[in-house]
Structures are given as structure tokens and as C-alpha cells.
Swiss-Prot record:
It comes from Myxococcus xanthus. It is found in: Cell inner membrane. The record marks 49 as: Determinant of potassium dependence. Its cofactor is Mg(2+). GO terms for biological process: sodium ion transport. This is Putative K(+)-stimulated pyrophosphate-energized sodium pump. The lineage of its organism: Bacteria, Pseudomonadati, Myxococcota, Myxococcia, Myxococcales. One of its GO terms (cellular component) is plasma membrane.
Length: 275
């Protein structure tokens, strides 16, 4: 679980650094030539971020496979010690099929909830910014300072509150499925979430970065006949708005989901093995 940490952190660090450099250059009033350079670095950062997330998702997938094997061994050991046959993972077992279906649903549920969470938090921040412009005298004329602490407070509280639902799913789903349907269904849940979650997380990481870079590609004038402000550029901006939470929130969130579910399943394996 920790073997790829150094590589992932090193590759992932490039993107935020280049992105922040662009924001600092814009807020500092530096010339467009500086912003052009930081945009190039930001585009590269999106690519390195996708690569880094690929390492992280691959590491999570291998971890889940190892934990699944440990879960299988623990359940069978407990059942044999109690004089029961080993757990059946045959696809003719209806509980396994139900577990597979439930496991394939959970990554979509968590991905959707995190996407909606980002939208709600962004809406609250935009509303607060509008309130400050309306209520702080001289802010529109740059004669007064805004209140950035309030913005950070909203973002932090939203991040914590909106992660309650995905966290409950990741922790509560394995013991519930195992208790109600037995260890075979829980094994199916893990297998379904692994296959769907790993591919979904990779798709989100790569697609989000591609949509973000597509907007930058158009803004640099590399798509003849479609300058900044055109219909194609507006569509690319929408793609960027979807791509950012895709690659930065939902993709990593799904990878974490399958890993947490596997750990929780291993912890409760001996408790639900006899059901």
C-alpha cells in the first residue's frame, strides 16, 4: 500500500506547483508572456497528474487483489475450523451475483456523489464572493480588501461535510452485505467494485486531464477558426469544468473506495464467515 508513495507524490506535486505559479503570475499582474509560459507548464502538469494517478490507481488495484486473497483465506480458515465447507464463489451462487451487481454500482454512486459535492461547494463559494462584492464598500473599485478566510472556511467545511456520505458507504457496505447475504456476496461485492472501480478511476483521471488540456489547446490558437470565446471554446470550458472534479475528486475517490472496502472486509471476515 505504501510502495508507490514516493513516485506518486513526486509526479503529482508538479501539477499543483505549476498551476499555482500561473495563479500567482495572474494575481501579480505580470505580462501575458509569463502567463503563456505558466499555461504550458500547467498543461504538462495535467499530464503528469494523470500519470501519477495511474500509479496510485494501479497500486490500489494490486492492494485490493492482495486483500481479497487474504479475505478469502480468512473466511475459509474460519469456516473449516467450525466444520463448515469452504466459501462458494461459483457464479451459479445467486448471492455472489447479487454482490457483483452491488459492487459494480458503488463506484458510480460514490463518483456521482463527489461530483455533486464539488458543484455544491463551488456554488456556495460563488455565492459568498457575490455577497462580498455587494456588501463590502469599495471592493468592486479595488479600494477595499476581500475576506478570503470566509472562502477558505466554506471550502474546508464543505469538503469535510460532503465526504461523510461516501465514507459511510465505504465503511458500512461490506459488513452490511456480509451480514445480510453472507461471505460469498461480500466476495462478489469486492470483485465487482474492483473491476468497475479501477477502470472507472483510470478513465476519470485521463479524461479529466484531456478535457482540461483541450481548453488550453484552443486558447493558444492551435485550432484554426475557433478562437477564444467561440462556441467550440465555450464547449471546451464546460468540459474543463467537468474534467477538474473528474480527475481531482471522483477518480481518486473511487480508488480510495475500493481500497477501504477491502480493508474493512478483511477486518470483519471472521465475523461474517459463518453466515
Amino acid at each position: 500500500m505504501l510502495g508507490g508513495t514516493a513516485v506518486v507524490m513526486t509526479v503529482d506535486a508538479y501539477g499543483p506547483i505549476s498551476d499555482n505559479a500561473g495563479g500567482i503570475s495572474e494575481m501579480s499582474g505580470l505580462g501575458p508572456e509569463v502567463r503563456a509560459i505558466t499555461d504550458e507548464l500547467d498543461a504538462v502538469g495535467n499530464t503528469t497528474a494523470a500519470i501519477g494517478k495511474g500509479f496510485a490507481i494501479g497500486s490500489a488495484t494490486l492492494t485490493v487483489i492482495a486483500l481479497f486473497s487474504a479475505f478469502n483465506l480468512e473466511v475459509n480458515h474460519t469456516r473449516i475450523a467450525a466444520g463448515l465447507p469452504e466459501m462458494s464463489l461459483q457464479l451459479t451462487n445467486p448471492n455472489v451475483i447479487v454482490g457483483l451487481l452491488l459492487g459494480s454500482i458503488l463506484p458510480f454512486l460514490v463518483g456521482a456523489s463527489t461530483m455533486l459535492a464539488v458543484g455544491r461547494a463551488a456554488g456556495a463559494i460563488v455565492e459568498e464572493i457575490g455577497r462580498q462584492f455587494r456588501e463590502i464598500p469599495g471592493l468592486m473599485e479595488l479600494k477595499a480588501d476581500p475576506d478570503p478566510k470566509k472562502i477558505v472556511d466554506i471550502a474546508t467545511k464543505s469538503a469535510l461535510q460532503e465526504m461523510v456520505f461516501p465514507g459511510i458507504i465505504a465503511v458500512a457496505a461490506p459488513p452490511l452485505v456480509g451480514y445480510l447475504l453472507g461471505p460469498g456476496a461480500l466476495a462478489g461485492l469486492l470483485a465487482g467494485s474492483l473491476v468497475v472501480g479501477a477502470t472507472m478511476a483510470l478513465y476519470m483521471a485521463n479524461a479529466g486531464g484531456a478535457w482540461d488540456n483541450a481548453k488550453k489547446f484552443i486558447e493558444k490558437g492551435k485550432l484554426p477558426g475557433h478562437a477564444k470565446g467561440s462556441a467550440v471554446h465555450k464547449a471546451a470550458v464546460v468540459g474543463d469544468m467537468v474534467g477538474d472534479p473528474f480527475k481531482d475528486t471522483s477518480g481518486p475517490g473511487v480508488a480510495i473506495l475500493i481500497k477501504v472496502m477491502s480493508v474493512v472486509s478483511l477486518l470483519v471476515a471472521s465475523l461474517i464467515a459463518l453466515r
